[in-house]
Curated annotation (Swiss-Prot):
Residue ranges annotated for the Fe2OG dioxygenase domain, each copy included: 80-179
EC number: 1.14.11.-
Secretion signal, residue range per the UniProt entry: none
Gene Ontology molecular function: 2-oxoglutarate-dependent dioxygenase activity; iron ion binding; L-ascorbic acid binding
GO biological process, alphabetically ordered: DNA damage response; intracellular iron ion homeostasis
Protein name from the UniProt record: PKHD-type hydroxylase Bxeno_B2756
Cofactor note: Binds 1 Fe(2+) ion per subunit.
Source superkingdom: Bacteria
InterPro entries cross-referenced by the UniProt entry: Oxoglu/Fe-dep_dioxygenase_dom, PKHD_C, PKHD_hydroxylase, Pro_4_hyd_alph, Pro_4_hyd_alph_FE2OG_OXY
UniProt organism field: Paraburkholderia xenovorans (strain LB400)
Annotated positions binding Fe cation: H98, D100, H160
Membrane-spanning ranges: none
Matches recorded under Pfam families: 2OG-FeII_Oxy_3, PKHD_C
Amino acid sequence: MLLHIPNVLNAEQLRIVRERLDTAGDAWVDGRATAGYQGAPVKRNQQIAEHTPIARELGDVILASIERNPLFISSVLPNQVYPPLFNRYEGGMQFGSHVDGAVRVLPNGVKLRTDVSVTLFISDPADYDGGELVIEDTYGVQQVKLPAGDMIVYPATSLHQVTPVTRGVRVASFFWVQSLVRSDTQRAMLFDMDTAIQRLNATNADDAARRSLVGIYHNLLRTWSEP
């Protein structure tokens, strides 16, 4: 399931994040430092070094926002979230076609299975040319270039790339989530059911039928989840 989540960061949060990243200086390093053997040969960008104070500070802003975002919670069903990272593309930089690694290691040494990949756009799309996130999924090729503050979530199993940035600078945050539900198909079904339940809650739908659907949702989540 590929889902656009709007307005994850508000204007004030974006201003703070941009100002901190614009003045990050030597915290920006070669992005290949965090790439696996498959990604390194096709990766040309810069990243904020992992586990640095600025990465933790700005990552906490994003984590606090997604924890309060009902659309993110409903669609991703997060169990563990990898600390957000930050990247920058300019002057022809790109990231060729690749699949994200299956496992990441958290700062405390715990391994995280990457079920869902997340990109949060920090630059406004008018500020750069190119830089589309191109995702290949079961419905074909999707080109994604969202307003600043908006987020795209998609299965980490997807082949994807970032096209060359030919003008301006593209800055984004990216991270991975281990979901309570490993299967993308099952997550999508639960999301659709939860969305339908929320719509019923806003109407005068039969209360007994609504309670029955809520029970089915939680029983499916109980069956499929891996806490």
